[in-house]
């Protein structure tokens, strides 16, 4: 197998008394999508910031395209693109002006800047808004121009930190299609997300991080397969019902709870469902809902972290990362496109 396009090996990073990363390791092969999953504060953004030269690790190794990012940060920045939760383009410039600015900062010839700007504005359906100030753009348009800016210099590696946070379903689906097209053309993508459907659709491999440690990794199919072939989902009107049902059904399989609902992972769905109904009836418990279905990444996330995925919101870490990126671009010290 060829060398990975992205490599993190035993990364350690502390902030005061907080251990953000505790020996995190993962890799992404060329032309694939690696999804980093985890709750807020798990360490996903910290790992991404190290790989994109915005933070130095306390220990460990981080490489992009075989280059140690701490030894050659400027070269690394010229070979990657970065788009975060919040669009980092200049709101007081037009869409086209933002793309031209990134082109100049990454030292592209004038003709190439125009060619790339034309192509990206068309690709992201922004030609009709190219001369409007970005501050007049909708949330979906801002996310698209931000991603376009990250692609001006044709980076072979793209880092996306919660790229669809705050987007409506249609805009999210459109952006997924764009990412899929980039990967089909050979781009390597590292994607952090809490949208489990997003990881299920896009990621070739998934790494789950919690409390600064890798707690699971594999394909979506492999991760879901660890739970068993079927999930029985039971809902009650209160937490007391969940607690009583858990006592009755723990013998049937692995149980995870979430508020007024619990999920039972089993290998023989039909037999386990029959046993579930009998046990609930014997305990005089009447659930509001009872369903039998295939496991999802949400079940995996709940089983591994102890709670369901949160609604993604922009984090302070991400704001700091993008601010640092802007400083680098405007001072001419780097070419991270955000």
Regions found by a protein language model. Name each.
Residues 3-8, 13-210, 216:
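ABC transporter nucleotide-binding domains
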Residues 20, 198, 241, 272, ...:
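Short phosphate-engaging motifs
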Residues 67-70, 131, 214, 239, ...:
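Short, surface-exposed acidic/glycine-rich loop or hinge patches that mediate macromolecular interfaces
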Residues 78, 228-232, 286:
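A generic structural signal for short beta-strands and their flanking turns/coil linkers
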Residues 107, 232, 254, 285, ...:
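Non-catalytic alpha-helical coupling and interface elements of nucleotide-dependent molecular machines
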Residues 176-267, 291:
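ABC transporter nucleotide-binding domain
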Residues 269-338:
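C-terminal coupling/interaction segments
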């Amino acid at each position: 197998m060829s060398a990975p396009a992205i490599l993190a090996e035993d990364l350690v990073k502390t902030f005061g008394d907080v251990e953000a990363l505790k020996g995190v390791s993962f890799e992404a092969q060329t032309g694939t999508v690696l999804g980093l999953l985890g709750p807020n504060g798990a360490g996903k953004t910290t790992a991404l910031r190290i790989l994109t030269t915005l933070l130095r690790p306390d220990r460990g190794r981080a490489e992009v395209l075989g280059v140690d990012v701490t030894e050659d940060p400027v070269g690394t920045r010229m070979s990657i693109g970065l788009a975060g939760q919040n669009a980092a383009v200049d709101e007081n410039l037009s869409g086209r002006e933002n793309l031209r600015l990134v082109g100049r900062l990454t030292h592209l010839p004038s003709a190439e800047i125009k060619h790339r700007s034309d192509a990206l504005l068309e690709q992201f359906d922004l030609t009709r808004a190219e001369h409007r100030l970005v501050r007049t753009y909708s949330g979906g348009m801002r996310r698209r121009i931000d991603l376009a800016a990250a692609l001006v210099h044709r980076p072979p590696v793209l880092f996306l930190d919660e790229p669809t946070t705050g987007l409506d379903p249609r805009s999210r689906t459109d952006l997924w299609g764009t990412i899929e097209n980039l990967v089909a053309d050979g781009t390597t993508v590292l994607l952090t997300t809490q949208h489990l459907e997003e990881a299920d659709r896009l990621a070739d491999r998934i790494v789950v991080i919690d409390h600064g440690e890798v707690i699971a990794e594999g394909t979506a199919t492999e991760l879901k397969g660890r739970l068993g072939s079927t999930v029985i989902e039971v809902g009650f009107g209160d937490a007391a019902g969940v607690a009583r049902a858990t006592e009755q059904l723990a013998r049937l399989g692995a149980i995870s709870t979430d508020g007024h609902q619990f999920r039972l992972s089993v290998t023989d769905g039909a037999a386990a469902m029959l046993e579930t109904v009998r046990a609930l009836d014997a305990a005089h418990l009447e659930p509001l809902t009872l369903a039998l279905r295939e496991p999802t990444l949400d079940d995996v996330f709940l089983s591994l972290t102890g709670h369901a995925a949160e609604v993604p919101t922009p984090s302070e870490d991400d704001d700091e990362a993008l601010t640092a990126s802007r400083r680098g671009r405007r001072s001419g010290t780097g070419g991270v496109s955000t």
